[in-house]
Amino acid sequence: EWIVKACNKLQGQYTSGPCSVSQKAAEAAYTGTQEPVKEMQKAFERRRDLIVKLAKEVPGFEVNVPQGAFYLFPKCSYFFGKSNGERKIENSDDLAMYLLEDAHVACVGGTSFGAPECIRMSYATSDENIVEAIRRIKEALAKLK
């Protein structure tokens, strides 16, 4: 029994704290140049502005400018009750699945995020992928009547 307790204590010490390598990496991130961070911030602002502009052109979407992270939450309830002839869209989860299957674009229904009338779209990707994704989404949504 005492061996188990000793091993348990030892294991806790090994796994409960960050390793020295990650501590050094964190120190370098905090004390080093912030230029890469500024470049990433500009890139995400550009992508945000691009996806907002393009999503506002999607008939049926209501779009607000995101204030944090890298997700857009367009309101999509306009499409609830609509169908492509094969499946009926009842909620944002149905719409996200439809967009995955028909447009091959991954979105997430907003219910899990407290926004059941929205879908969550990430813009943590290239400008080209954003443009192509919105093109595919528009094409898929146009099939819903």
Where are these regions (language model features)?
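PLP-dependent class I/II
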Residues: 1-145
